[in-house]
Amino acid sequence: GNGVDVDIDKAIEYYELASHQDYGIALYNLGLIYEHNEQYHDDLKAIKYYEAAIDQNDVRAMYRMALYLDEGKVIAKNLDKAFTYLQIAANQGYGPAMNMYGIYLENGIGGYKKLDEAFKYYLASTSDEYVPGIYNLARCYFYGIGTTVDKASAFKLFLKASERGYYDASFMIGYMYSYGDGINQDKQKAKEYFKQAANKGMKEAIEELNKLDKEV
């Protein structure tokens, strides 16, 4: 191989050995390789290892399984089971799970809608700077989801997520500048942020840019 393949082979060998001792981290890492590595890609194997890691209470494996169960492409869609995994992983402080659990609670996925709890989980997910969580917390402040509307806090958080390449947040900053919503109107700055989102192919951002271009 080109060196990289050999390393993956060695990693698999190493993790396989460790997995026989039921090391959750080794089982989880094997799952990641089979889920994400092009050469070794095998979703069913990934799921097998994630399930074994879950038996060892690995919260990251619970989150990966929740994604599979939520999507329902490789295995049957099961939102109740995904909800349970997310709840356990979220309550053990795993950022991505806290954020996704917040989405479930916000939208009533898995049969339980609680906006104030969704807000709490989004807030908790930001403690380790998890960017999608920062964006969702900003949305809560912007729209008043599970908390009171606070446009200043929303702006700060959207900006933070935008600076880390989260283009949905760039769109929201553009929107706030374009319409003077919560901040002073600045069409030039609005364009800059809409462009960031438009460059990622976001249709709404392209539409907003077109509107601004017609005004000039």
What are these regions (language model features)?
Residues I8, Y40-D43, L79, L115, ...:
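TPR-repeat structural position
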Residues Y49, Y85, A97, A205, ...:
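Generic L/I/V-rich hydrophobic alpha-helical segments across diverse proteins
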Residues Q196-V216:
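Terminal, low-structured helical/coil segments at or just beyond the last alpha-helical repeat
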Residues G1-N2, H20-G24, H36-E38, D42, ...:
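Short helix-capping/linker turns of helical repeat alpha-solenoids
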